A protein has these predicted regions:
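Basic, polar low-complexity surface loops/patches
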Residues: 1-195
């Protein structure tokens, strides 16, 4: 079940609900253990160490604090929840991914920085010009604009600096602009993803 869910979202750290804990396995466990300074353990204790499955976990009731720390570091987290009561399950407990959290899609107040918007943006660029959209899904605030002409880059950078998005989705044309990518990553500490 875990491997099937992880295959659906290989770019996410998978928080897999097992009883009162969210568990991470394999490379996710190694990464989370290092990033959050958690103890790395393993399954299959009877096997040689090289064949054991690395794992680490966090209590489900305090998972938001751990997720917030991972999001602040730019990671994406997929939450895989138990969809039925384990006591009533016949065989494996049915599980499904109920939420994917990225730096720009945080909605839980405990994960948000007080007094600061949490914008996600989309930048579309082609030979005709540049389109730009900002949205803070925690407040519903949204802004859309476009730029053409010789001052388009200046306007684009001004708007990006004004809104300071936590995450940016870039079209192929925008992603191929090295200066734009550097500005977003190095100046704004923004997580990037490519959209087609």
């Amino acid at each position: 079940q875990y491997l099937r869910m992880k295959e659906l979202h290989p770019d996410c750290i998978l928080f897999f609900r097992l009883g009162d804990f969210y568990e991470m396995f394999n490379e996710d466990a190694k990464l989370v253990s290092k990033e959050l300074e958690l103890t790395l353990t393993s399954r299959d204790r009877g096997k040689p160490e090289a064949q054991r499955t690395p794992m680490c976990g966090v209590p489900y009731h305090s998972a938001d604090a751990y997720i917030a720390r991972l999001i602040a570091k730019g990671y994406k987290v997929a939450i895989c929840e138990q969809m039925e009561d384990p006591a009533l399950a016949k065989g494996l407990v049915d599980r499904d991914i109920i939420r994917i959290i990225t730096p720009g899609t945080v909605m839980t107040s405990s994960m948000l920085e007080e007094g600061r918007n949490n914008f996600i943006c989309a930048v579309y660029r082609d030979s005709a010009g540049t389109g730009l959209c900002f949205c803070d899904i925690s407040t519903g605030e949204c802004s859309v604009t476009s730029f053409t002409g010789p001052e388009a880059d200046e306007h684009l950078y001004n708007e990006l600096g004004r809104f300071t998005p936590r995450e940016a989705m870039l079209s192929d044309g925008a992603y191929s602009d090295g200066a734009l990518v550097d500005f977003l990553v190095k100046r704004l500490d923004c997580r990037l993803s490519l959209i087609h």
